[in-house]
Amino acid sequence: MATFDDVKDVIVDKLGVDGDKVMPEARFVEDLGADSLETVELIMGLEDKFGITISDEDAENIRTVQAAIDYIESKQ
């Protein structure tokens, strides 16, 4: 199962944000300052970390930390 800490580690690594800013309700673009390239890198990082494939359509709907956790848990 995806844990908050595992997802947080990928976010901190890919977006270069302070871990204290990564909360379940945080939005990748608005709250964490991710640009379009960083969001693609984030999705790829989550795919690698959890051994899943995230379609482009699904990736567009993953906008918050909690949405990422929920999606990953639904695929495992």
From Swiss-Prot:
The keyword Lipid biosynthesis applies. PROSITE patterns: CARRIER, PHOSPHOPANTETHEINE. It holds the Pfam family PP-binding. The keyword Lipid metabolism applies. Belongs to the acyl carrier protein (ACP) family. InterPro entries: ACP, ACP-like_sf, PP-bd_ACP, Ppantetheine_attach_site. GO terms for molecular function: acyl binding; acyl carrier activity. Its main location: cytoplasm. Pathway: Lipid metabolism; fatty acid biosynthesis. HAMAP family: Acyl_carrier (MF_01217). Keywords: Cytoplasm, Fatty acid biosynthesis, Fatty acid metabolism, Lipid biosynthesis, Lipid metabolism, Phosphopantetheine, Phosphoprotein. The gene is acpP. 4'-phosphopantetheine is transferred from CoA to a specific serine of apo-ACP by AcpS. This modification is essential for activity because fatty acids are bound in thioester linkage to the sulfhydryl of the prosthetic group. One of its GO terms (biological process) is lipid A biosynthetic process. Carrier of the growing fatty acid chain in fatty acid biosynthesis. GO terms for cellular component: cytosol; membrane. Residues 1-76 form the Carrier domain. This is Acyl carrier protein. It is found in: Cytoplasm.
